[in-house]
Amino acid sequence: MRIAIDLDDVTVAIMDGLLKYHNGKYNTEFLVEHHTSWDLDKIWACTPNEAMRRVYDFYKSEYMDKLLPMPGAIEGIHNLNDKHSLFFVTSRPTFIKEKTTIWLNEHLPNLSIPVYFTNQYSPEREKKEKKSDVCKRLNIELIIEDAPSNISDCVTNNIRVLVYSRPWNTSLIDTELMTRVHTWKDIVSNIS
């Protein structure tokens, strides 16, 4: 099977790192549980441009260099890689491609999984691409994803989704093309 895997908050615990950075820099006490949507400006009480600037500052910080894998992700990816063709499809902007490659080489050193950047969380002037378009181009049969907008986009385009459960996607209800998973063990057993 051809499987796409999201990076942030599916493979990489980016929200944990982002909140450590944000709480330290802005003297806040946010937890992952507070983030029930991806409207960071509303949660952080700032403008959308300010929220994007804060995220970009985080991308450039040492916190970004110290991100940990999501629990069970490394073992799960190795397990899936033995039986399936894997592709990382991420909303990350291309300007952090080098940091992304370094992280993948550190945590998944013996795997050569291609990475596709869709630039979805980037300034308007950068070319963005829908994850569903990347998945269709790659003939992806299943994507593991946490972002509601990407989940909806993929389901609308008839791509099966394993919804990695996070506070910002709890309102989504399973459908024929959408199944909620809570752990990487759930992911592997659902695919096997």
Language model feature labels by segment:
Residues M1-A51:
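Active-site neighborhood of HAD-like aspartate-dependent phosphohydrolases
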Residues M15-D16, R92, S165-P167:
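Short, flexible active-site-adjacent loop segments at beta-strand->alpha-helix junctions, enriched
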Residues V10, T94, S149:
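Conserved Rossmann-like nucleotide-cofactor binding loop
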Residues D82, K97-S192:
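C-terminal cap/substrate-recognition subdomain and adjoining C-terminal extension
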